[in-house]
């Protein structure tokens, strides 16, 4: 039997024969070889190999960074205009401001434009966000002037055929952009200048674009590297196991918590092969290349990295459950170390401790590389080498490789050779086969949380190991420990909701409807008033439960950061409690109810509603609502108020970027006193910057309405399978002071409504009346209304009803109809005939038409549509989820819609000129 060394020599000489994965050599079979290698190691101890990590005694954060390294970070931050954000970090709210740049699809011209260009593109989920190419906007008069004698000479010997060459020559003398910036340097500089919440948002958007995410962020200036655990917590992915036969094949979880096989790719010394390109090929399905990891063949990919060496990136593969599409049958994680392992030993040690297998790419294995890897002789990780050996160094490579084989406990199947003549597709298949073999065998499976534990032991800083973050986590766990059953918790701990709130909302709704009756019976009015007061007295007699009190303490913290940490922890903790269950469509549930003998009251949810932060805030709103009602009726002295501070607490959250509930999703009613209190408090906080434009979005469930708003403005409206589309939420967008005068407002209040059911469901019971009232309210408050549609004739009847009612009142918001391509079909170009069909009332809308006895409204609406008010948006995904990225066509179409909306506001087409006080009055009238 040939020795391992001879086998490797044969493999290298005949590198085109890749063979099959062979069984590994057992450690017991190579004890003699290890002893010989140990003697050779000791003999080389005195040699100057350029490495001092062999004994592993100095593995904590290195404090001896060269002075030149310390200046590189400051130079990069200064170049990018980020030096001012080192003491006071860049925040998420800074990145959301509406400014002149929000209306321009501009290209960066100087390095200081790059961070903002990256954030804008990333907010819009644009796949070109990482492109740091700069374009100088130089007017023709600034082009280099020719010398007079040269110009005269060219006039004498002018030849039309030379025009093209002359143009090229003149352009070559144009001023060139400043020093180009490597995209990885830009990312590192931006993250180092951002607070933890903006970091989290950046990584979330990058994951939607299918970009590799930073896991270990290098910072040579301050002598530490940061493991980004907190920043990754917001990334949630869905996947399906093969085969798609059972309901349990679907999973949705945070990438931080999922334990999966993990494979690391590193470079030792130099390598002719690109790690990142190889990783992209491994992750990409047949005939579709994904550039998940930025590599040398992309724009500026060959630019030298100034501050991003030592960066560790992570990406995942998640299966779709379809064998013909999936590269792997189960989720897997992939790590990529930027830079040489000898210069970034700490990061390499981390990767060896968390990976199922480590792939080392190198062209050279000499004495110093051998000495470096010998220190890993106690490692239990599987190692694979991908070689592209220099012709003159084959013998040296073989000699040291033969010595490493027993040390690392590998055999010839762990040594792969890839040269220019190697079949690339076959090589990628070989790598995938190795990974599948490792995953099938007993191997290390880790989550990002597990990686963070290993990082702490090695001395890396973990970004969530701060007092404020941990205090907020402890408070969240204190609340969640008491939640054993979600439905029971809602009933026992959130007592003011459910049936009491529903009865109160129904009575107040009937009371409000009496104002439209010419001569309402006074006796009926008095009876409704008595019922409302009786219910509010019962609610006011309750005390906030311990869980609600703990929640109020968490969001009332004097530290803004601790408040934000607490809210994020609560969102994730509550989401874990209510993992999404397979659900039938609401149409099916509606048809089943009569058979099951269930209630016919369609104000009840058609699907289980998960417990969320909004339920705790809704409970606070009910306490405030009940107390305010009794004070108005003279049943409670104003001096005995206990909950007057609640609106101020909630408004702080709104200003911090949390969507607040405007319409109660449980009762489909608006708590007028609570919302009025919120708006009054907001008016006080904003002081003189309270001019508002209200933009609302309505539509059928599942049309991507919330995703559209989030992509357009960087908002945080709930999306996904675990959301229950009920009620309406509002979020505030600040307008930059330099732009507010031009735009005509200081703030944009964005309202995202729950889905309005269309078709058969819309005409069932009182549901239509409730949703028509909701649509009337939201459209009546709005300056601009976006109606999201799934089909060209699928305008919800509630929207048409509301339009007709508001037209009678003389209120006409600016309408934009958005048809989203949900099935990845070719998007037709909008034609006037399509617009007319879109607005023609279908037969099942005759009820809305009959109610108002008004046909002109439809003609008016159709007239609006013919003036470019209909948008056809391409499909969201490019490819098949969960590994699909957001399509460039979707991102660009959303940007054009955003620009149109802002132009309409700027040109006064939205009938703005209202402040918060006027909005309060409008709310009361509607």
UniProtKB/Swiss-Prot annotation:
Protein name: Up-regulator of cell proliferation
Function: May be involved in cell cycle progression through the regulation of cyclin D1 expression.
First and last residue of the signal peptide: none
Keyword Nucleotide-binding set for record: yes
GO MF annotations, alphabetized: GTP binding
Keyword Cell cycle belongs to the record: yes
Protein family: Belongs to the TRAFAC class dynamin-like GTPase superfamily. Very large inducible GTPase (VLIG) family.
Example of a GO cellular component annotation carried by this entry: nucleus
Domain VLIG-type G per the UniProt entry, residue ranges: 689-924
Membrane-spanning parts: none
Record key words, sorted: Cell cycle, Cytoplasm, GTP-binding, Nucleotide-binding, Nucleus, Phosphoprotein
Taxonomy, superkingdom: Eukaryota
Pfam families attached to this UniProt entry: URGCP
Modified-residue entries (Phosphoserine), positions: 3
Subcellular location: Cytoplasm; Nucleus
